[in-house]
Regions:
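Acidic interaction surfaces
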Residues: 1-83
Length: 83
């Protein structure tokens, strides 16, 4: 798969977090929340514990591939651009 398949993001899971949660991540960073807390809140909002066994397994497999370093760096860049 080519990088441009996900608009330059590492994989589909990372791209999905960018599309679905970036605004929330920026807001939470602005409020002083830690990166670990933000990841917990995003995971909690997806409610993997309510998924069936197969859905939960797929969720955690995708979760493990998210490039959080790039996500948080992009969020910080977005914060700097809005100042």
């Amino acid at each position: 798969m080519l990088m441009n398949d996900y608009n330059g993001w590492k994989n589909q899971a990372t791209w999905s977090v960018n599309v679905l949660h970036m605004e929330t991540i920026v807001e939470m960073l602005n409020k002083g929340n830690s990166e670990e807390y933000i990841k917990f809140q995003i995971k909690d909002s997806c409610k993997p514990e309510d998924m069936n066994l197969y859905g939960r397994d797929m969720f955690y497999s995708a979760w493990a591939t998210i490039d959080w370093y790039t996500i948080f760096n992009r969020a910080k860049e977005n914060m700097e651009q809005t100042v």
